[in-house]
Amino acid sequence: MQGSARDFLKPKLVESSQTGVNEFKVILEPLERGFGHTLGNAIRRTLLSSMTGFAVTEVVIDGVMHEFSTIDGVQEDVLDILLNLKEVSVVLNTVETAQVVIDKKGPCEITVADIETNGIDITTFNPDKVIATINDEGHMRMTLKITAGIGYDAAASRTDEASSIGGMQLDASFSPIKRVSFTVDAARVKQKVNLDKLNIMIETNGSVNAEVAIKRVATILQEQLSSFVELELVEEEVSLPTSEDFDPQLLAAVDELELTVRSANCLKAEQIYYIGDLIQKSEQDLLRTPNLGRKSLNEIKEVLTEKGLSLGTNIENWPPVDLMSE
């Protein structure tokens, strides 16, 4: 008789701590022997290749037609400026692409903090990063295109996209994850020895914390492996609940709460699509969501209260099987 997956130990997130500037350590245990390296490799590769983020993908600098130019009154040449722009760490909170402007006269250093948002809801995570240095007679105006994406996108792959006149395409590293490593130590549970403890060290660009990143990776891996699940391994035939078994209020889309755009986008980024998904989250869960602050949390609580609902509610057998298949 084949063993059930239920016989395996289920690991827990036992530690999530910050060890330095944008550096985090996450510990998962206990894991069955060998699963430390199996999950460690999968998590590491997915963190580096498949996380969503934002990057500067195109720049137009007034008076500059190509990247091999120099600019009067500017210390750096254009190639150096482009390299600096690749390291700009920002997040667009309400849109997936936007154009922003930097317009400065010398003498001064141009930094990420000099980006003019023009009403766009944008958060910068390395405002002191120097982009260029201008002398007494220097003047620089540039238009940056910031775009959402996944992983790494070479400029050459965007040759078919419409570019601005004088626009220079940049290789874009969208991932908010800069570095990932892991180690596997021995662990034990009561009399059971030879188990694994997985230690994951993560360095980010500041736009995401480690615990949120791990949860996103787990969701990605779960979705990718879902087609391989063998339903015949389930030991008992269980009658799965359908939408008819739940309060219709719980089946309504989060959009029906008429939240602000920022709050709604934050929830969708965490794959919270239905009110039933939302009310099972605690306040702490929501506050760990990137870009969702106390103001957005209070808004969500107020709207739920008006409907007689509250956060931290446990819904047995959620979600209904027909909702999962949509």
From Swiss-Prot:
Keyword Nucleotidyltransferase listed: yes
A molecular function annotated in GO for this UniProt entry is: DNA binding
* GO BP terms: DNA-templated transcription
Under catalytic activity, the entry for this protein gives:
RNA(n) + a ribonucleoside 5'-triphosphate = RNA(n+1) + diphosphate
Q: Does the keyword Transferase apply?
A: yes
Q: Where is this region: Alpha N-terminal domain (alpha-NTD)?
A: 1-232
Query: EC annotation?
Result: 2.7.7.6
Segments for region (Alpha C-terminal domain (alpha-CTD)): 246-326
Q: Which InterPro entries match?
A: DNA-dir_RNA_pol_insert (IPR011262), DNA-dir_RNA_pol_RpoA/D/Rpb3 (IPR011263), DNA-dir_RpoA (IPR011773), RBP11-like (IPR036603), RNAP_asu_C (IPR011260), RNApol_insert_sf (IPR036643)
Example GO CC term: the record gives: cytoplasm
Which keywords accompany this UniProt record?
Answer: DNA-directed RNA polymerase, Nucleotidyltransferase, Transcription, Transferase
The record's disulfide annotation reads none
| Comment text on domains | The N-terminal domain is essential for RNAP assembly and basal transcription, whereas the C-terminal domain is involved in interaction with transcriptional regulators and with upstream promoter elements.
Family stated for the protein in its record: Belongs to the RNA polymerase alpha chain family.
- What is the stated purpose of this protein? DNA-dependent RNA polymerase catalyzes the transcription of DNA into RNA using the four ribonucleoside triphosphates as substrates.
Instruction: State the oligomer form and interacting partners.
Output: Homodimer. The RNAP catalytic core consists of 2 alpha, 1 beta, 1 beta' and 1 omega subunit. When a sigma factor is associated with the core the holoenzyme is formed, which can initiate transcription.
By what name is this protein known?
DNA-directed RNA polymerase subunit alpha
Organism equals Vesicomyosocius okutanii subsp. Calyptogena okutanii (strain HA)
Phylogenetic lineage: Bacteria, Pseudomonadati, Pseudomonadota, Gammaproteobacteria, Candidatus Pseudothioglobaceae
